[in-house]
Amino acid sequence: MVTLSNTSMVGGRDLPSTGFAWWSGNARLINLSGKLLGAHVAHAGLIVFWAGAMTLFEVAHFIPEKPMYEQGLILLPHIATLGWGVGPAGEVTDIFPFFVVGVLHLISSAVLGLGGIYHALRGPEVLEEYSSFFGYDWKDKNQMTNIIGYHLILLGCGALLLVFKAMFFGGVYDTWAPGGGDVRVITNPTLNPAIIFGYLLKAPFGGEGWIISVNNMEDIIGGHIWIGLICISGGIWHILTKPFGWARRALIWSGEAYLSYSLGALSLMGFIASVFVWFNNTAYPSEFYGPTGMEASQSQAFTFLVRDQRLGANIASAQGPTGLGKYLMRSPSGEIIFGGETMRFWDFRGPWLEPLRGPNGLDLDKLRNDIQPWQVRRAAEYMTHAPLGSLNSVGGVITDVNSFNYVSPRAWLATSHFVLGFFFLVGHLWHAGRARAAAAGFEKGIDRETEPTLFMPDLD
């Protein structure tokens, strides 16, 4: 029987020689570094091909007169957030940049695909045959940390690419720009470590919101400067040093262990991304992704306040059915907030609402005299595009399923990342358990001799 703790038999790519059936995928290539490289490069090619093809699909179906979030788009909003093809208020001014991004991804996917095919079929089975620099052994702790170092440097460069785009190559879209958002060059990113790392020390609940509470582009770009430099510095550190004794003893050093570590990290990122896209309207502007749930609720309260005020209602003193303020009331800390069911979202901050605030919450004088037409239009739009799928009202938002066919990209992205994060967590636990069992020498493995498929006739 072949197990991960008994790999002396591993040599080919079939079940008898590796102990892994075809559906075990890359496990068959544990000791074939060249073939494993081919699998990884081809996988990257498939990912990039999807990105390019799906971008062109969205470009082909794009309707300029409708907001992106009403068209089920999940890729064009990311390109627009980077400042390509959009202008004031997030209006699409040119779809050619979207087309270019899609084509570039298709071209690069072809290069990656050819590289994957080459390494899978023609290249050296084991990279050590080609170069000692690219060769590795899963138990070679120093080489493993070298590979970590290369990855960290690439990740750091990726973070700095966003910085360069924001500061030197046309800027990025800032939903907080005056008048309803615009593309803006970030000239003064936040570098103060107390501010950047202060986000990590915030509570993850309520108005604190941990890193998800970031509400300005200066902090986002400054954070990427810090992350980029930290990743590059960490990469250089891991290349130049060898693992300390405690790390050698505490960690499991095998291919499956590295897989489990990676899945755990991706799971954490998935959960963070899920919450980020659900709550944050700075990194994920509502002009492209649609309003947050809290934003839609506050928009509805604002829309009806504007309507009834024009009809003569006294918004300051009108009472609702509970005896609380119908339009305005006090928060627990004394701020003036919207009344009604949306009171639970009194912590909400949005670029269309903030101009109407004063030193103590919403400013009554501004609500009576300074509401601008663009704020009313945007609130009405957001009110009818809540990222909700409920049969009843949520936060006071009417979610009648008979209205029109709409699913918010925010709901798609938040849900998909949460579900994927959960499955990656399960995968992390599964592979971590197997890796530790293999290292301890008591892994059972699966007795392939009694596997039913081995006794079935060929399909043809």
Curated annotation (Swiss-Prot):
PSII is composed of 1 copy each of membrane proteins PsbA, PsbB, PsbC, PsbD, PsbE, PsbF, PsbH, PsbI, PsbJ, PsbK, PsbL, PsbM, PsbT, PsbX, PsbY, PsbZ, Psb30/Ycf12, peripheral proteins PsbO, CyanoQ (PsbQ), PsbU, PsbV and a large number of cofactors. It forms dimeric complexes. One of the components of the core complex of photosystem II (PSII). PSII binds chlorophyll and helps catalyze the primary light-induced photochemical processes of PSII. PSII is a light-driven water:plastoquinone oxidoreductase, using light energy to abstract electrons from H(2)O, generating O(2) and a proton gradient subsequently used for ATP formation. Required for correct assembly of PSII. It holds the Pfam family PSII. The gene is psbC. Residues 1-35, 122-142, 241-255, 437-460 are cytoplasmic. SUPFAM superfamilies: Photosystem II antenna protein-like. This is Photosystem II CP43 reaction center protein. Binds multiple chlorophylls and provides some of the ligands for the Ca-4Mn-5O cluster of the oxygen-evolving complex. It may also provide a ligand for a Cl- that is required for oxygen evolution. PSII binds additional chlorophylls, carotenoids and specific lipids. It is a multi-pass membrane protein. Belongs to the PsbB/PsbC family. PsbC subfamily.
